[in-house]
Amino acid sequence: MRDALCFFGQMAAKWRETGAIAPSGPHLAKIMARTVGPLAPNDVVVELGPGTGAFTKALVKHFPNNRVIAIEFNPVFVRNLRAAVPKATIIEGCASKMPQYMDELGIERENVGAVVSGLPLLMMPKDLCRDVFDAIAQTLVAGKPYVQFTYSERAWRRFEPPGFRPSPSRKVWLNFPPAVVLPFTRAS
């Protein structure tokens, strides 16, 4: 309940940044984590735009032996995430600076096992959207997964992230609103 109240307060105050009408549900979060696939023991998972932490919690649970790093722009969400998910590393900042954050944490590109995103990328200004995709491409080596969710699969059909190959999407009806999980693989 506390997560929902926090989310709705931030959604009302910062609609463009939040980009959703409700926090992601646990079923969607579980599917997002499973879609990542297996990770090597030293791999980290980077989450972009964790919001209230539904995906963060699912990632920590699904990958108990791997480090989860979440990058969140909203300071209110950051404060709540740090308290709610102490096993995750929470970075307050912009997803477009992900390569810099990985360098600061001493994480090699080869050890980034996946990027998971809850960002409303297609609602962002085009320059920022491009910068975020560039950051994802710079961070992931070939063959590694990038998992995005959206409420509008149609909008994503017209947009394919440069440097990534799409895989079949999955509709998640047990979420409000229903969502689509979009898996991509970093191309060589």
Whereabouts are the PLM-identified features?
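Conserved beta-strand signature within the Rossmann-like core of class I S-adenosyl-L-methionine
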Residues: 142-150
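Conserved class I S-adenosyl-L-methionine
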Residues: 41-51
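Conserved SAM/SAH-binding beta-strand->alpha-helix loop
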Residues: 74, 94
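A short glycine-rich, Lys/Arg-flanked "PGG" loop and its adjoining helix->strand segment in the class I
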Residues: 130-142
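Class I SAM-dependent methyltransferase Rossmann-like catalytic core
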Residues: 2-39
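Conserved SAM-binding loop
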Residues: 81-82
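Conserved SAM-binding loop of SAM-dependent methyltransferases across substrates and taxa
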Residues: 52-64
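Core SAM-dependent methyltransferase catalytic element
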Residues: 171-188
